[in-house]
Amino acid sequence: QRGSRGQRCGPGEVFNQCGSACPRVCGRPPAQACTLQCVSGCFCRRGYIRTQRGGCIPERQCHQR
């Protein structure tokens, strides 16, 4: 999927005009304090989680790493 500026999203990602500034990352605890601000860009699809390398994988694979 492409964003408004022609940005190409990777596998398991979707472009969102107003996504979280603090996405969940596999192997890291959730952010304790995250400001409620809109960030546009590529975000993991529902049921996926960001890896520490930057890609998105199914959440069920996160616990296997």
From Swiss-Prot:
Keywords: Antibiotic, Antimicrobial, Disulfide bond, Protease inhibitor, Pyrrolidone carboxylic acid, Secreted, Serine protease inhibitor. GO terms for molecular function: serine-type endopeptidase inhibitor activity. One of its GO terms (biological process) is defense response to bacterium. The keyword Disulfide bond applies. Disulfide bonds join C9-C42, C18-C38, C22-C34, C26-C62, C44-C56. The modification Pyrrolidone carboxylic acid is found at Q1. Residues 9-62 form the TIL domain. It is found in: Secreted. The record marks L36, Q37 as: Reactive bond. InterPro entries: Ser_inhib-like_sf, SerProtInhib-TIL_Domain, TIL_dom. SUPFAM superfamilies: Serine protease inhibitors. Belongs to the serine protease inhibitor-like (TIL domain-containing) family. Inhibits chymotrypsin and elastase. Has antibacterial activity against Gram-positive bacterium M.luteus and the Gram-negative bacterium E.coli. This is Chymotrypsin-elastase inhibitor ixodidin. It comes from Rhipicephalus microplus (Cattle tick).
